[in-house]
């Protein structure tokens, strides 16, 4: 059986940490930021972990 290919869209969106958790960027911080409050854009900074319900699905896309 050939090797399974990693889902290229998922590999660009998700990253696995050293402990095995999957992290992602938060949404709503790409464009049209001028009308959004600064508190909201600051809250959306950085990364967050993928929910436990989605972890299994994302793992299969990343061949985990």
Curated annotation (Swiss-Prot):
Q: Name the species this protein comes from.
A: Mycolicibacterium paratuberculosis (strain ATCC BAA-968 / K-10) (Mycobacterium paratuberculosis)
Q: Where is this region: Disordered?
A: 1-22, 34-64
Hydrolase as UniProt keyword: no
Please identify the protein, giving its name as recorded: Large ribosomal subunit protein bL35
Which GO terms of the cellular component aspect does the record hold? Answer: cytosolic large ribosomal subunit
Against SUPFAM superfamilies, the record matches this protein to:
L35p-like
Family, according to the entry, reads as follows:
Belongs to the bacterial ribosomal protein bL35 family.
User: What are the BP-aspect GO terms?
Assistant: translation
Q: Which UniProt keywords apply?
A: Ribonucleoprotein, Ribosomal protein
Please note every region of biased composition (Basic and acidic residues).
Answer: 34-46
Chain intervals with Polar residues compositional bias: 50-64
List, in alphabetical order, the Gene Ontology terms for molecular function in this entry. structural constituent of ribosome
Name the InterPro entries for this protein.
Ribosomal_bL35 (IPR001706), Ribosomal_bL35-like (IPR021137), Ribosomal_bL35_CS (IPR018265), Ribosomal_bL35_sf (IPR037229)
At the top level, the lineage of the source is Bacteria
HAMAP family xrefs: Ribosomal_bL35
- Pfam families in the record: Ribosomal_L35p
């Amino acid at each position: 059986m050939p090797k399974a290919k990693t889902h290229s869209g998922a590999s660009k969106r998700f990253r696995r940490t050293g402990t095995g958790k999957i992290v992602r960027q938060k949404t709503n911080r790409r464009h049209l930021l001028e009308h959004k409050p600064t508190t909201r854009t600051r809250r959306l900074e950085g990364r967050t972990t993928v929910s436990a319900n989605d972890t299994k699905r994302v793992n299969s896309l990343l061949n985990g």
